[in-house]
Amino acid sequence: FATPVLGALFRLAGAIPVAPQKEDPVVYQRAFEAASKVLADGDLLGIFPEGGITRDGRLQPFRGGIARIIERDPVPVVPVALLDLWGSSFSRIEGGRALARPLRRGLFSRIGVAVAAPMPARGLTPEALQHQVQHLLDIHSLSRTSTPTP
């Protein structure tokens, strides 16, 4: 949100600013309040439960924010996996920096999305959600490496 052009795009898209609780407790608390309002209004809320961009291309442990959100607002959670991001401008492949070479894979590089069935909030843990997202990633990986049998 601090970068002028990206910040404007984030605000236009309705993104919610988030900061680690230790870094900025006020922004941290406001993020959960804003998330609750989005859900109370009947809108969709997309989050990145890892809490940051991967530095090695692998799915990182999911943090507790998702648990806090569904504890306050018990809505179904739709597991979504973003595919083929590693090596794109959205990864930290260039010495830990994101957006280092935006056109590395060309002007029209492809990324994908895989979606699983909604999971009920009751009893859902960050670990269970992470397992489902990892399953989506594994299926995608297998589909790219296996050859169809005639």
Q: Where do the protein language model's features map onto the residues?
A:
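Catalytic core of membrane glycerolipid acyltransferases/transacylases, capturing the structured
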Residues: 1-25
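Hydrophobic/aromatic ligand-binding patch that stacks against planar heteroaromatic rings
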Residues: 9, 37, 68-72
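A conditional alpha-helix N-cap/helix-loop micro-motif detector
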Residues: 24-29, 59, 126
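TIR-domain catalytic/interaction hotspot
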Residues: 28-37
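Catalytic-site beta-strand/loop segments enriched in glycine and acidic/polar residues
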Residues: 36-67
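A cross-family acyltransferase "interaction/gating" segment
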Residues: 55-124
